[in-house]
Amino acid sequence: MLPPAKHPHPKWLADAIFYEIYPQSFVDSNGDGIGDIPGITLKLDYIKDLGCNAIWLNPCFDSPFKDAGYDVRDYKKVASRYGTNDDLIALFDAAHRRDMHVILDLVPGHTSEEHEWFHRSCKVERNNYSDRYIWTDSWISGGDGLPFIGGESPRNGTYILNFFKCQPALNYGFAHPERSWQKPALGPDAKATCDAMVDVMRFWLSRGADGFRVDMAQPRQKGR
């Protein structure tokens, strides 16, 4: 296994005082009964007056919300209940004008079962997403101690999940592969998953996000 890369911490982080916000229970700006991102922007001065200079924004991406947004359907789209991508970019800009920073909750270990990646991974025909998730090689075989779901996909295999049925585990490989379906942690399939997640981070960093709080930040490989 490769050692973790070393990068300097951003200077602002040393003095950061975070205010954590779960969007739906904060400020409702449009009267629909659900907190939203424009509501957060309206309260930036209030948050700064409390002595906070950074915001940790809990999951705000498109999701069926079967697990409070920790089941992401589209990493590059803000959940419609919270607003739009432009609303989130406006929050970044407004925070920066106040010398504040915003980090996003990133869930890299699994997606929603409604994510397009998973829909493609379920197909019988091999494609670029067949190994984006962890699948066994037979629908009657379990996950060697890992939780799994079988019999719900056209392909022959069961998929490994992290928590709930709605959260299929993304494939970052196995530290010590022992089965034919267990991909190596440094193999091309695991690298493709890593590259996809890096692409998500670059997408939001390029639009003004200051960083990420990584959910389940321990190494994503199985079998460690």
Give the predicted meaning of each segment.
Residues M1-D45, D49-L50, N162-F164, N171-F174:
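Conserved structural scaffold segments of CAZyme catalytic domains across common CAZy folds
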Residues P8-F18, Y22, S112-G223:
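Alpha-amylase-like alpha-glycosidases and glucanotransferases acting on alpha-linked glucans and related
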Residues I21, I47, L57, Y75, ...:
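Conserved, mostly hydrophobic/aromatic
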Residues D28-S29, Y46-A90, P108-S112, M216-R224:
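Aromatic-lined carbohydrate-binding/catalytic grooves of carbohydrate-active enzymes
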Residues G39-P64, D199-G211:
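Catalytic domains of carbohydrate-active enzymes, especially glycoside hydrolases
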Residues L91-R126:
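Hydrophobic or amphipathic alpha-helical targeting/insertion segments
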